[in-house]
From Swiss-Prot:
GO terms for biological process: photosynthetic electron transport chain. This is Cytochrome b6-f complex subunit 4. Belongs to the cytochrome b family. PetD subfamily. HAMAP family: Cytb6_f_subIV (MF_01344). It comes from Amphidinium carterae.
Length: 157
């Protein structure tokens, strides 16, 4: 059922529709069609997909936990690997804490570098892109070194 007929004599509407632009103001309304019929189908599909993945999942993944045995080396979660390795390889604790405090400072300075240039294209902001790529590669290298031994974890050595 069409709710409202379009006014096709207007040149702006015809030119916008010819280019594939414009909004779909005409046709079926969202209430009750989408909300009563499409949303429950999507919600039930998502729930059944999640339950299906839960049913076919392997039960035994890794070793069972033993609360009375301490592992040889305790590793943090994966997103703390670069900072863990940075604290581990620096000889002085004050230098390690200052280096960790410098990470948010570098992030804030990168945001200011991005605001100096008015362009949104990353290829037209080479300084900010270079800072971002360099720090990302160094963080990935630090994260990889955290799972190695201390003699192999030293970057740039």
């Amino acid at each position: 059922m069409v709710v409202r007929l379009p006014y096709v004599k207007g040149s702006i509407l015809c030119s916008a529709l010819a280019k594939g632009c414009g909004h779909n103001y005409y046709g079926e309304p969202a209430w009750p069609n989408d909300i009563l019929y499409i949303f429950p189908v999507v919600i039930l599909g998502t729930i059944s997909f999640s339950l299906g993945l839960g049913v076919i999942e392997n039960q035994a993944i890794g070793e069972p936990a033993n609360p009375f045995a301490t592992p040889l080396e305790i590793l943090p979660e994966w997103y703390f690997f670069p900072t863990f390795n940075l604290l581990r390889i620096l000889p002085d604790k004050l230098v390690g804490v200052l280096s960790l405090a410098s990470v948010p400072v570098i992030l804030v300075l990168t945001a200011f570098i991005e605001n100096i240039n008015r362009y949104q294209n990353p290829f037209r902001r080479p300084v900010a892109s270079l800072v971002y790529l360099t720090s990302t590669c160094y963080a990935l290298w630090l994260g990889y070194g955290s799972v190695l031994g201390i003699s192999e974890a030293l970057p740039f050595v």
